[in-house]
Amino acid sequence: MDIDASVENISKDTAEIIEVEELKELLKKDEKRAYVGFEPSGKVHLGHALTIKKMKTLQDAGFKITIFIANLHAYLNNKGTLDELNEVAKYNIKCFKALGLSEDTNFILGSDRMTPEYITEVFKAAKLTTIQRAQRSMALVSRNETHDVAQTLYPIMQALDIHDLDADIAVGGMEQRKIHMLAREILPRLGYRPPVCIHIPLIHGTDGSDKMSSSKGNFIAIDDTPKEIKNKINKSFCPIGVSEDNPVMEIAHYYIFDTHEKILIERPEKFGGNLELTEEELIQTYENEDLHPMDLKNTVSKYLIERLAPAREYMENN
């Protein structure tokens, strides 16, 4: 695959790339690395899976992939005790493997990187960062409106992780953008290269809120049973005639139409009979109110259950 084709492939379902020209230069290298960090969370859901899809795309483009399990960062962010977070981390790693990353994917626990050299670099980076900048960087990452001192270390540590892991690309959801911009600013001042940053859209929660989140319960987990998936989608926010910011339509976009050119909507003849639609046709049909939300939900449930079957099977057998 040539460079322009690789960039186009990487750019698919991406909110932004900072900067595209830098990405093109990276693609010319024989050795190139991309990383993403996750706080250990109770359940790995479709929001996480969208990011893992991007890591698989980068893997296919020749990047060595590191999945950084940020247990210490989560501890600083008041997400639990270290013992609790370490247990959740084991489960999360199993989930990420279930999503189809290659065998050579590197999984690293944040607490394993706490060398004296790393701590010294954190101190140096802290001297280049104001309290206000650190707090702004945490705004979309923390649940709290006010931050303690430990939380202000979080974005500084994350910026240093990029260098410490020798990553050329930092991947994350849009909530990570301010931290990544901090990294692009302070790493060169410490004598290190700035990362290319790839930001993934945030999937709406099943309740229609801005973000699918383990803590809010508005998610579909990658190891949910078929019954759980169907129940969650049936209860999902899905306003009639509205496709924008509709979580059910988003699931169709990211997890059905990425592998299907058309989908089959099965319904009784008295309700219009079966439909076979492209994504564009589905959007138009739904916005014209020629498709009932329940027919949409039933169809998306069927395809999503099928899509997640390999992950469920992996989780059951490993």
Swiss-Prot record:
**Which residues participate in ATP binding?**
214
Which gene specifies this protein's sequence? tyrS
Q: What task does this protein carry out?
A: Catalyzes the attachment of tyrosine to tRNA(Tyr) in a two-step reaction: tyrosine is first activated by ATP to form Tyr-AMP and then transferred to the acceptor end of tRNA(Tyr).
Record motif 'HIGH' region, residues: 40-48
List cystine links.
none
Tell me one GO biological process term: tyrosyl-tRNA aminoacylation
Which protein is depicted? Tyrosine--tRNA ligase
Q: Look up and give the organism this protein is from.
A: Methanosphaera stadtmanae (strain ATCC 43021 / DSM 3091 / JCM 11832 / MCB-3)
| Motif, 'KMSKS' region: chain positions | 211-215
Which is one GO molecular function term here?
A: tyrosine-tRNA ligase activity
Pfam family, any one: tRNA-synt_1b
The entry's keywords: Aminoacyl-tRNA synthetase, ATP-binding, Cytoplasm, Ligase, Nucleotide-binding, Protein biosynthesis
| Principal subcellular localization | cytoplasm
Q: Which cellular components does GO assign to this protein?
A: cytoplasm
User: What are the subcellular locations of this protein?
Assistant: Cytoplasm
> Is Cell membrane found in the keyword set?
no
Give the binding site residues for L-tyrosine: 35, 154, 158, 161, 176
| Subunit structure and binding partners | Homodimer.
Q: Where are the transmembrane segments?
A: none
